[in-house]
A protein has these predicted regions:
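Short, small-residue alpha-helix embedded
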Residues: 207-237
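Conserved N-terminal subdomain of the carbohydrate kinase-like
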Residues: 2-114, 118-126, 268
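Conserved phosphate/ATP/ADP-binding segment of small-molecule kinases
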Residues: 126-199, 208, 229-232
């Protein structure tokens, strides 16, 4: 078998769903990481014709069996990863597969980033059970850093939905955590505890409904980490990237309602590199 490691390029395993139309999950992670010079390898948890935000009649293909088969093949190949990131899972079984993947592939220097997709706006998504929440807590305990929104932070800690971030951060199952989408007056941003530091990053709130902001942030954050920035320094850089994408998307409303126009910012960065 020909060698597949040692190329000098950072490699990331992305465990998430693939929405073939719409800007979320793997359809944003793959191009963003690639533009940052990272070899991005996808392990799809599901394949959808579109994402589920605002579309009707979408088609879903569950990939649970393929997740196990793909992982086993990569293990036989001896693949190694500098970063493993996770997003959407459709069942407790898939969360167990992801935990097994981390145990099999995460080495001492591998960064594990978990975006614990569970809910938003104060509610657990209807497709999830309490068993999924329990399995997600266990997965977060294997991570080096997690990026829940406020709702997900409350679900992971078993807290009331009005619990403040200062209370939530030390209760989360991972010592390094970025709570995303936190509102503060006319601003929106991030409250984090990273490498023992307490960090806040805020930007002006743009009042439009957006899909996939968490996926774009997590992708940019992973890319910044793999480009040599620590957990702390990568946060404002990823926040700046997302902020630029939001402003670009606002200019394209209402036609671009289904996701972030991240391509504009990638194009600018590619030209300036």
């Amino acid at each position: 078998m020909k060698p597949v490691n040692g190329s000098g390029m950072k490699r990331a395993a992305l465990i998430n769903d693939l929405s073939c139309f719409g800007k979320c999950s793997l359809s944003v992670a793959l191009p963003i990481l690639s533009a940052y010079g990272v070899e991005a390898i996808s392990l799809p948890t599901a394949i959808l014709s579109t994402h589920t935000g605002g579309f009707e009649g979408y088609v879903v293909r569950d990939m649970t069996d393929e997740m196990r088969a793909f992982s086993a093949h990569w293990k036989r190949m001896g693949l190694k990863f500098d970063l493993i990131s996770t997003g959407f899972f459709s069942s407790p079984e898939q969360l167990e597969i992801a935990a097994d993947f981390i145990h099999d592939f995460a080495e001492e220097e591998t960064i594990v980033l978990v975006d614990p997709v569970l809910g938003d706006n104060g509610s657990l998504y209807g497709c999830f059970s309490e068993a999924c929440v329990e399995k997600m807590r266990a997965l977060c305990a294997l991570a080096d850093v997690i990026s829940p929104n406020h709702t997900e932070a409350c679900l992971l800690t078993g807290s009331a939905m009005d619990t403040g971030v200062e209370t939530l951060l030390p209760l989360l199952p991972c010592p390094n955590a970025v709570i995303t989408g936190v509102r503060r007056g006319a601003e929106i941003g991030y409250e984090a505890r990273l490498d023992g530091e307490r960090i806040s990053v805020y930007k002006a709130y743009v009042p439009i409904q957006l899909h996939g902001t968490g996926d774009v942030f997590a992708s940019a954050y992973a890319a910044e980490i793999l480009n040599g920035h620590g957990l702390v320094d990568a946060l404002p850089r990823a926040a700046e990237f997302l902020d630029a994408c939001i402003y670009d998307t606002a200019k394209r409303q209402p036609a671009h309602w289904y996701g972030l126009a991240f391509e504009d910012e990638l194009k600018r960065r590619t030209r300036n590199s």
